[in-house]
Structures are given as C-alpha cells and as structure tokens.
C-alpha cells in the first residue's frame, strides 16, 4: 500500500496509516517508531470518557495539498542542519533543549516545522505516560497542545478542522485533528 501511494499516487507519505490498519488492536493505542518500524501496544482505558472521531465532509486530494511540500521542508531542515555539522537521520533525533541553538540556522517556517516534529515526539511519549497512568485529563491537554502545534508550526489544519476542534473543546477534555490535515479527507 505504501509503495502504491508513493510511486503511483505521487504522495510522499509515511507508514503510520498502513501500520494502524494492519496492526490495530481494539482498546489499544499503537506506539510506532517509524525509523525502526518497532511498535508496541498500550491499553486505552478512558473510563467514563469516550473517544470520538469526526469528519469535516470537506473533500480534498492530498496530492493537490501542501502535504508533499511539508515532506520536502523537513528534508530541507535535515540538509541545512547537516551543513551546520548537525547530522541526524530524522528530525525527531533533535532534542527540545537544542532547539534554541538551532533556531538561528533555519528560516522561520522551517524552524517551526522542526519544532513541531520535536515537540510532537515529546507529546507522544507524554501521551503514553499519561495513558499508562490513566490520567485522562492530561491526555486531553496533550491533544489540545498537539493540534495547536499542527495549526501554528506545521500548518496543516485549516478552517474546517480548526472549527471542529474549537467546537469540540467546548464539551470535550481535548481535541486534535487526525490524519494528514488540510481540512478534508480523500
């Protein structure tokens, strides 16, 4: 499926969707390291809370969105860091504490892409920690922070996703977009 999306559809996508479809397990979250392809399951117990997935009903084609542009931008970040003697295999290897030192080496929009990747990596690990501690309110806070980063640093949300997220937060403990973004679905 991944080869088809990349080679025939022209979408420079990752492997998360395929892994979720093939390895998804009821009442569990799948923690996937996309660089090593190692994965593990974590029990999802929300107590009296429910997990809802909403759809914008706004059609879009990822190949016609800025999705591939975001992939290229992340590649540019790696190249610029390499020119500055910072060699990494993927952006998530950058530590949060190193972001301040790196900021002046990148144009603002590329720094924000990097900051999203690095802080999202931490949010994922914090989410797993909160999940293992059954801290549902912390899970909601992390979802909110993630969406704000996707909106402001990675810039992949859009009007429809932001509207749903904003409305959901009025009655939910947390809300974030899921999928590739750009306000719609294929």
Q: Over which residues does each language-model region extend?
A:
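Alpha/beta catalytic cores of group-transfer enzymes, especially the acyltransferase/condensing modules
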Residues: 1-39, 162, 175-181
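C-terminal nucleotide
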Residues: 28-176
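Local cysteine-cluster metal-coordination motifs and their immediate loop/turn environment
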Residues: 63, 183-185
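FabD-like malonyl-/acyl-CoA
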Residues: 173, 185-186
């Amino acid at each position: 499926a991944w080869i088809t999306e990349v080679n025939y559809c022209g979408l420079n996508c990752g492997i998360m969707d395929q892994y979720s479809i093939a390895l998804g397990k009821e009442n569990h979250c799948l923690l996937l390291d996309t660089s090593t392809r190692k994965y593990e399951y974590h029990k999802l117990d929300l107590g009296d809370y429910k997990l809802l997935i909403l759809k914008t009903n706004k059609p879009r084609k990822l190949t016609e969105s800025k999705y591939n542009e975001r992939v290229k931008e992340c590649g540019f970040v790696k190249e610029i860091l390499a020119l500055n003697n910072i060699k990494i295999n993927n952006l998530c290897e950058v530590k949060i504490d190193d972001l301040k030192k790196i900021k002046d080496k990148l144009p603002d929009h590329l720094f924000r892409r990097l900051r999203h990747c690095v802080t999202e990596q931490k949010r994922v690990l914090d989410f797993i920690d909160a999940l293992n501690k059954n801290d549902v309110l912390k899970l909601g806070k992390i979802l909110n922070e993630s969406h704000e980063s996707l909106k402001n640093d990675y810039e992949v949300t859009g009007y429809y996703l932001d509207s749903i997220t904003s409305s959901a937060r009025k009655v939910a403990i947390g809300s974030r977009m899921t999928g590739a973004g750009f306000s719609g679905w294929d």
